[in-house]
């Protein structure tokens, strides 16, 4: 699973940042992900996955805190 967030910073920069690659296995077999545990739990939580609006609202807050700028859109694929 990949999570990308469209962002706009206070300095006027904007773009899309890839913030997670989930279920990618290393050579040693360990899975990698680049999200804080709190956000990872929300991605994994069925309640958030079935209620997209609530999931996006909650994740945008956490992701913006991590990335440090305003999040306009979150895409998961």
Regions of interest found by a model, annotated:
Residues 25-67:
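Acidic, low-complexity, intrinsically disordered interaction modules
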Residues 75-77:
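Solvent-exposed beta-strand sheet faces enriched in polar/charged residues
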